[in-house]
Amino acid sequence: MTSVSLGMPAAPPPVLAPRRKTRQIKVGSVGVGSDSPISVQSMTTTPTTDINATLQQIAELTASGCDIVRVACPSADDAEALPIIARKSQIPVIADIHFQPKYVFAAIEAGCAAVRVNPGNIRKFDDQVKEIAAAARDHGTSIRIGVNAGSLEPGILKKYGKATPEALVESAVWEASLFEEHGFHDFKISVKHNDPVIMVAAYEMLAEKGDWPLHLGVTEAGPAFQGTIKSATAFGALLSRGIGDTIRVSLSAPPVEEIKVGNQILQSLNLRPRKLEIVSCPSCGRAQVDVYTLAEQVTAGLEGMEIPLRVAVMGCVVNGPGEAREADLGVASGNGKGQIFVKGEVIKTVPESQIVETLIEEAMRIAEEMGEADGEDAVKGGPVVSVS
């Protein structure tokens, strides 16, 4: 039996700073905080009342690598749908509650793993913390105190004039103190803003105030490209300093795209084991092959492979051979041909028309050998692919 030694680490190496020490809470079966892996969340876009559509979207999110899912609960009809959704979902469900405190209790009774509360817009929220804490404790439900720049309490807005980092943190710490006064500690906190600079400052400030697990998010981040940049910038700044215990990338895009981006951010910081990664040059005047098309074809051909494999697609002889040698599998193209490398060794030279086919064949061979060595199928699921 042949085993394949790959260049990428099996376990994530240390990040730039040690992980911040926090208490641990449970969101269903998923630990958040302390030494629990950083989880990736998303939120459904279907009407919660459409139970089948919501469960279908949750299944798609689960398949893409989502750890925790949030569903909206703006009405009594939505609240009535929660028990079935919570019971049938493959991953923990969080109910997202605004305005009406009665839906907090409904979500807890429905069996949701957690409830997100927005203290800035739930009527008389502070007066009901004692009852919410008691209900959550009785049902083993955790809470997210979700402070948002767009819905801060009027008193705090008046004090600070706008949603500053200090305003976000003051709101969060106040609500945390109320829960703790009633002996409830199973909560995490978020202080979201649509400006990554303000968001980062708020989380850094909040991290100094207590040992609460922190849910990272840039609110209203925007369309896919803009939102990805904002989230990657903010999350990278915080996670590299050890701040953050669960993340949600907010995009004006299908929820599955949020999971792809979130997983890629964690993998890029070595906070989650890498899977399939495509390394390709940006192309330039030296390129002797259509790198864009080649990279897209290789990416499409390897879709569905869940192996820690780095594949290099290079377009010329300047950096091509070196990059290809550093990868587990790669090609350096030029003069109508492609040199195929496996672990730094040239195994063959093929015509340009056969590059994609050859790379896919070699990747499949490596995957099969890994599957035999591990006693499991390594060619399944959906990879997180980056073409740079």
UniProtKB/Swiss-Prot annotation:
The residues the record assigns to binding [4Fe-4S] cluster are 281, 284, 316, 323
Q: What is this protein called?
A: 4-hydroxy-3-methylbut-2-en-1-yl diphosphate synthase (flavodoxin)
Q: Which cofactor does it need?
A: [4Fe-4S] cluster
EC number of the protein: 1.17.7.3
**Can you provide one Gene Ontology molecular function annotated for this UniProt record?**
4-hydroxy-3-methylbut-2-enyl-diphosphate synthase activity (flavodoxin)
GO BP annotation list? isopentenyl diphosphate biosynthetic process, methylerythritol 4-phosphate pathway; terpenoid biosynthetic process
Question: Catalysed reaction per UniProt?
Answer: (2E)-4-hydroxy-3-methylbut-2-enyl diphosphate + oxidized [flavodoxin] + H2O + 2 H(+) = 2-C-methyl-D-erythritol 2,4-cyclic diphosphate + reduced [flavodoxin]
Top-level taxonomic group: Bacteria
EC category name: oxidoreductase
InterPro entries, alphabetized: Dihydropteroate_synth-like_sf, IspG_bac, IspG_bac-typ, NO2/SO3_Rdtase_4Fe4S_sf
Gene that produces this protein: ispG
Question: Which family does the similarity line name?
Answer: Belongs to the IspG family.
Describe how the cofactor binds.
Binds 1 [4Fe-4S] cluster.
Q: Which UniProt keywords apply?
A: 4Fe-4S, Iron, Iron-sulfur, Isoprene biosynthesis, Metal-binding, Oxidoreductase
Q: In which pathway does it act?
A: Isoprenoid biosynthesis; isopentenyl diphosphate biosynthesis via DXP pathway; isopentenyl diphosphate from 1-deoxy-D-xylulose 5-phosphate: step 5/6
Pfam families in the record, alphabetically? GcpE
Role summary: Converts 2C-methyl-D-erythritol 2,4-cyclodiphosphate (ME-2,4cPP) into 1-hydroxy-2-methyl-2-(E)-butenyl 4-diphosphate.
